[in-house]
């Protein structure tokens, strides 16, 4: 069993208390066994699609999918993969908005297991803590590597940053294209979905909120 970092535990517990964790169940199965079982199930699915698993192009497809699920696109379900984060005391007393724009995300819609992708803008105003800028990107990537709802993904990143930074002053905006809308069903190739979460001064202070909204508009042009 993997030992989780203090930061991973803090975030996991915060999400659980707020009812924002993915609908997980406890399975005491190691990754090797998980991959083997997923491979077997994928083999059955491919077979039921009348595809020849002995063909060169399909021979290793079930194994590839199992490896991809566990090690890549759903790796965020395992908190042992939570990014290593050093919480830095705000000794420089930074009190201005810090913004990271244009963070690319690729996630998987949990309704159809089809990709959605887009861009994220995140701002925060430090109080006691700051973190390295790249850690914000890594937190975004961690939570995107799950079967997701965009609404939940937004809230998970938002609360994770509030928890680690020990401040309510966090804002997040996600603009994404959902391929369950684009590639099936209504086949709408041009619509996007936006979600926003505002906390602290971003919610209560009009000027702070407008500065964040300006950052979003700048990113989208």
From Swiss-Prot:
This enzyme's EC code(s): 3.5.4.16
Alphabetical list of Gene3D superfamilies matching this protein: 1.10.286.10, 3.30.1130.10
SUPFAM superfamilies with a match to the protein in the record: Tetrahydrobiopterin biosynthesis enzymes-like
InterPro entries (alphabetical): GTP-CH-I_C/QueF (IPR043133), GTP-CH-I_N (IPR043134), GTP_CycHdrlase_I (IPR001474), GTP_CycHdrlase_I_CS (IPR018234), GTP_CycHdrlase_I_dom (IPR020602)
Entry annotated with the keyword Magnesium: no
Pathway: Cofactor biosynthesis; 7,8-dihydroneopterin triphosphate biosynthesis; 7,8-dihydroneopterin triphosphate from GTP: step 1/1
Catalytic activity line of the entry: GTP + H2O = 7,8-dihydroneopterin 3'-triphosphate + formate + H(+)
GO molecular function per UniProt: GTP binding; GTP cyclohydrolase I activity; zinc ion binding
Positions that bind Zn(2+): 109, 112, 180
Alphabetical keyword list: GTP-binding, Hydrolase, Metal-binding, Nucleotide-binding, One-carbon metabolism, Zinc
Gene Ontology BP annotations: one-carbon metabolic process; tetrahydrobiopterin biosynthetic process; tetrahydrofolate biosynthetic process
Record's GO cellular component terms: cytoplasm
Matches recorded under Pfam families: GTP_cyclohydroI (PF01227)
Zinc recorded as keyword: yes
Enzyme class, broadest EC rank: hydrolase
Family annotation (HAMAP family): FolE (MF_00223)
Similarity-based family: Belongs to the GTP cyclohydrolase I family.
Subunit structure: Toroid-shaped homodecamer, composed of two pentamers of five dimers.
Name this polypeptide is given: GTP cyclohydrolase 1
């Amino acid at each position: 069993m993997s030992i989780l970092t203090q930061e991973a535990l803090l975030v996991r517990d915060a999400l659980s208390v707020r009812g924002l964790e993915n609908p997980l169940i406890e399975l005491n199965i190691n990754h090797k066994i998980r991959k083997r079982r997923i491979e077997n199930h994928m083999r059955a699915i491919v077979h039921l699609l009348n595809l020849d698993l002995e063909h060169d192009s399909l021979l290793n497809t079930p194994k590839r999918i199992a490896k991809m699920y566990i090690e890549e696109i759903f790796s965020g379900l395992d908190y042992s993969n939570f990014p290593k984060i050093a919480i830095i005391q705000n000794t420089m007393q930074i009190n201005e908005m810090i913004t990271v724009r244009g963070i690319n995300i690729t996630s998987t819609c949990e309704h159809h297991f089809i990709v959605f992708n887009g861009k994220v803008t995140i701002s925060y105003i430090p109080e006691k803590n700051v973190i390295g800028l790249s850690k914000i990107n890594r937190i975004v990537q961690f939570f995107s590597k799950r079967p997701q709802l965009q609404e939940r993904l937004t809230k998970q990143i938002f609360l994770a940053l509030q928890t680690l930074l020990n401040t309510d002053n966090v804002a997040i905006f996600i603009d994404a294209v959902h391929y369950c809308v684009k590639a099936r069903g209504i086949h709408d190739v041009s619509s996007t979905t936006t979600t926003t979460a505002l906390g602290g001064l971003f919610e209560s202070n009009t000027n702070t909120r407008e500065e964040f909204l300006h950052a979003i508009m700048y990113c989208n042009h």
